[in-house]
């Protein structure tokens, strides 16, 4: 079975910025890939937090140029929240895939076994994250959109304009 693909339709400062299409490594990290896929479709309904288990309408709250763009906190919106389809947090599945360059999709965490819904897209090779963050996919279309998101980031991670996932799901 081919690996699933998902998309984000992005806005930057309220303006359409284009589509990011990602392939999820369900063959290597099935639990992590399924969590992200279901959070893109919103098919699991409402989570324990009382918020929909859905990336739609959530923001990239932390964008650091020449490093990464982080999002997926749909409960608090500031990097303190998020929730997986399995409950609050889940274990690191494996560290088979590496942070090899731009477009790598990886789980943000607060230490071992703390995966929820927050993720990041690398804009450079970030090999120091290997063995600490679970790589579970890659951008296959729209890396230019990721680069545009990177342009509104800062050293602190604060964005100069809101970066929002206006819509998301699986391409038909």
Curated annotation (Swiss-Prot):
It is found in: Cytoplasm. Its main location: cytoplasm. It catalyses: [protein]-peptidylproline (omega=180) = [protein]-peptidylproline (omega=0). The keyword Cytoplasm applies. It is an enzyme of class 5 (isomerase). One of its GO terms (biological process) is protein folding. GO terms for molecular function: cyclosporin A binding; peptidyl-prolyl cis-trans isomerase activity. One of its GO terms (cellular component) is cytoplasm. This is Peptidyl-prolyl cis-trans isomerase 1. The gene is Cyp1.
